[in-house]
From Swiss-Prot:
Subunit structure: Interacts with the GDP-bound form of Rab GTPase YPT1. Interacts with YPT10.
Record-linked Gene3D superfamilies: FAD/NAD(P)-binding domain (3.50.50.60), Guanine Nucleotide Dissociation Inhibitor, domain 1 (1.10.405.10), Guanine Nucleotide Dissociation Inhibitor, domain 2 (3.30.519.10)
Protein name: Rab GDP-dissociation inhibitor
Region feature Interaction with YPT1, mapped onto this chain: 106-112, 234-259
Provenance organism: Saccharomyces cerevisiae (strain ATCC 204508 / S288c) (Baker's yeast)
Predominant subcellular localization, coarse grouping: cytoplasm
Lineage: Eukaryota, Fungi, Dikarya, Ascomycota, Saccharomycotina
């Protein structure tokens, strides 16, 4: 990029091209803000990039195999787009809404994930996608199925302003455990509703007011209803397409991008100590505020106390007992293994253009609870059958120490162990509110803007 042509003054500087940062730069550009977006790395995605097989070996293996051996086993490098952080989109979730409203769906194609499964007593079972599937599900006995059907009917017919639909329950006063009790649901049903539908990672939610759980279960049911089969969507060519889609949105609205540009120095105003700009090899750039991922300001972040282990597994066969599904999610609830946190397994395949023909990618993640984290993943490995290659990494989770108002430095959170993007979009909305002073209201792009 020719230094002569680059402006030096902006409304916002964004550091890092993770999905959180790219959504925010896209939204702020649409709002008319002049955005400069910089990444020290030479590719989009930050911690949540999609990488080729050779990059994967480079990142995780001490002694990578030769190119010849790799290609004879796994095919061409260009056929691989492997997510470093596994997540699916809820079909009716907030990220999908943002994609549709900003029209980023023009740049990214999606495919439905074939199924959602839950682990129970050593086997995996399909999570019922609706009342009809609940009736035929082997997860429950005949009387429990009726109770489950009534529970799902209550969820779908509940109206806030119609007390007759409330069944005597107050979502803000009754706990979720009391809701389950009202419908007479047993422990194993509570487990798969709470973990495979509401997608809670532990059981703390049982003693909390029911509303957040109600909303999560409703989101799950509405997401399933949108396309059938499962509530999840996944982008063709991997999750790395999402930051790039929002980067294109930002560029259409005048955003400037610089990859492979390390930050040499952060500048602060002498009198107030607030953010003033950054120095790079391409020059000095100024803006009244910055949005960044935690790696740019480690001193302004603190550990959440949690570490996540993720294992990327290459298979040359579908996962056993899943009807040869080309993609699925398996949730292993914590109580099944005597753990505090669930284990998630996300499986995609060549149907999504993320690996060479005949291969499958299974990515396992959980919050570490012992000093032997790789052993914690053993139950998930067993479900996959023979594994051709395995890459394992551990990430500490960080969050900002302050809200950014003092120094105008607004930091995103690390990507958690959850299997979907809802917590990430909460972070987007939270940062957007702190930066602009008003809540994010999604507006459809104007037709003339789409040209």
């Amino acid at each position: 990029m020719d230094q002569e042509t680059i402006d030096t003054d902006y409304d916002v500087i964004v550091l890092g091209t993770g999905i959180t940062e790219c959504i925010l730069s896209g939204l702020l550009s649409v709002d008319g803000k002049k955005v400069l977006h910089i990444d020290k790395q030479d590719h989009y995605g930050g911690e949540a990039a999609s990488v080729t097989l050779s990059q994967l070996y480079e990142k995780f293996k001490q002694n990578p195999i030769s190119k010849e051996e790799r290609e004879s086993k796994f095919g061409k490098d260009r056929d691989w787009n492997v997510d470093l952080i596994p997540k699916f989109l809820m079909a009716n979730g907030e990220l999908t809404n943002i994609l549709i409203h900003t029209d980023v769906t023009r740049y990214v194609d999606f495919k439905q994930v074939s199924g959602s499964y839950v682990f129970k007593q050593g086997k995996i079972y399909k999570v019922p996608a609706n009342e009809i599937e609940a009736i035929s599900s082997p997860l429950m006995g005949i009387f429990e199925k009726r109770r489950m059907k009534k529970f799902l009917e209550w969820i779908s017919s509940y109206k806030e302003d119609d007390l007759s639909t409330h069944q005597g329950l107050d979502l803000d006063k009754n706990t979720m455990d009391e809701v389950y009790y009202k419908f007479g649901l047993g422990n194993s049903t509570k487990e798969f509703i709470g973990h495979a539908m509401a997608l809670w990672t532990n059981d703390d939610y049982l003693q909390q007011p029911a509303r957040p759980s109600f909303e999560r279960i409703l989101l799950y049911c509405q997401s399933v209803a949108r396309y059938g089969k499962s509530p999840y969507l996944y982008p063709m060519y991997g999750l790395g397409e999402l930051p790039q889609g929002f980067a294109r949105l930002s560029a259409i609205y005048g955003g400037t991008y610089m990859l492979d540009t390390p930050i040499d120095e952060v500048l602060y105003k002498k009198d107030t100590g607030k953010f003033e700009g950054v120095k790079t090899k391409l020059g000095t750039f100024k803006a009244p505020l910055v949005i960044a991922d935690p790696t740019y300001f480690p001193e302004k972040c603190k550990s959440t106390g949690q570490r996540v282990i993720r294992a990327i597994c290459i298979l040359n066969h579908p996962v056993p007992n899943t009807s040869n599904a080309d993609s699925l999610q398996i949730i292993i609830p914590q109580s099944q293994l005597g753990r505090k946190s669930d284990i998630y397994v996300a499986i995609v395949s060549d149907a999504h253009n993320v690996c060479s023909k005949g291969h499958y990618l299974a990515i396992i993640s959980t919050i570490i609870e012992t000093d032997k984290p790789h052993i914690e993943l053993e139950p998930a490995f067993k479900l996959l059958g023979p594994i051709e290659e395995k890459f394992m990494g551990i990430a500490e989770l960080f969050e900002p120490r302050e809200d950014g108002s003092k120094d105008n430095i607004y930091l995103s959170r690390s990507y958690d162990a959850s299997s979907h993007f809802e917590s990430m979009t909460d972070d987007v909305k939270d940062i957007y509110f702190r930066v602009t002073g008003h809540p994010l209201v999604l507006k459809q792009r104007q037709e003339q803007e789409k040209q």
